């Protein structure tokens, strides 16, 4: 069991014992620090607030800078909470969480923010089939078609799939296998793809499902 914050480096391939190429994602996982310890008595639940990365103190608000100062740390780039049950032992504010909380072969969930695609049409965003390519039609190839009824219901239903902003959403990819752990360089290699572009921040937690 473990939990850590990290940065997506990119994708590569490794070869297994059957000489098969396995697509993998390389993640710089930690080292993280405990910015705050939350308890049931004080906060209503048990959790560790982890910090990752470094940020110029001028670029954080004074309350946030003071929050880091309580833990004896310089401002981090990312703050995120993880359940105490995911990390063995009792940690105090300022303690370090390294990549060695995970082992090779462990199954994890990776949380991140998907790549932003901007404003996208219905064919790209919702996989619509588009209009017919025949009978002389010329400009409706990627059009959405009708979005509502005539006199009944006389409105467009809420939630109707239309063009709009695509991507940039929180996403969890579950049940990825850790192929390799490299404590000396703070790297984890997981089988498969994880959300987001290169250099985006992710959270890795042991799977609970």
UniProtKB/Swiss-Prot annotation:
Protein keywords: Ribonucleoprotein, Ribosomal protein, RNA-binding, rRNA-binding
InterPro entries: Ribosomal_uL3 (IPR000597), Ribosomal_uL3_bac/org-type (IPR019927), Ribosomal_uL3_CS (IPR019926), Transl_B-barrel_sf (IPR009000)
Origin superkingdom: Bacteria
Pfam families: Ribosomal_L3 (PF00297)
Protein name: Large ribosomal subunit protein uL3
Family in the record: Belongs to the universal ribosomal protein uL3 family.
Subunit and interaction comment: Part of the 50S ribosomal subunit. Forms a cluster with proteins L14 and L19.
SUPFAM superfamilies: Translation proteins (SSF50447)
Gene Ontology biological process: translation
UniProt function note: One of the primary rRNA binding proteins, it binds directly near the 3'-end of the 23S rRNA, where it nucleates assembly of the 50S subunit.
GO CC entries: cytosolic large ribosomal subunit
The keyword rRNA-binding appears for this protein: yes
Organism name: Chlorobaculum parvum (strain DSM 263 / NCIMB 8327)
Region called Disordered, residue ranges: 128-166
GO molecular function terms listed in the Swiss-Prot or TrEMBL record: rRNA binding; structural constituent of ribosome
């Amino acid at each position: 069991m473990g939990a850590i914050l990290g940065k997506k480096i990119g994708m590569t391939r490794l070869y297994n014992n059957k000489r098969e190429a396995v697509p993998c994602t390389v993640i710089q996982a930690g080292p993280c620090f405990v910015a705050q310890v939350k308890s049931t008595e004080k906060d209503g639940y048990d959790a560790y607030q982890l910090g990752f990365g470094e940020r110029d103190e001028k670029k954080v608000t004074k309350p946030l800078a003071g929050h880091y100062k309580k833990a004896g740390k310089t401002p981090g780039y990312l703050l995120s909470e993880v359940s105490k049950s995911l990390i063995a032992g009792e940690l105090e504010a300022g303690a370090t969480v390294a990549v060695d909380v995970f082992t090779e072969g462990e199954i994890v969930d990776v949380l991140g923010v998907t790549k932003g695609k901007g404003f996208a049409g219905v064919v790209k965003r919702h996989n619509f089939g588009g209009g017919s390519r025949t009978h002389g039609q010329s400009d409706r190839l990627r059009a959405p078609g009708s979005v509502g009824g005539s006199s009944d219901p006389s409105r467009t239903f809420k939630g109707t799939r239309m063009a709009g902003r695509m991507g940039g959403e929180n996403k969890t990819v579950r049940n990825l296998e850790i192929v390799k752990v490299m404590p000396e360089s703070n790297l984890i290699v997981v089988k498969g793809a994880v959300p987001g572009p290169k250099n985006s921040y992710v959270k890795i937690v042991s799977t609970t499902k």
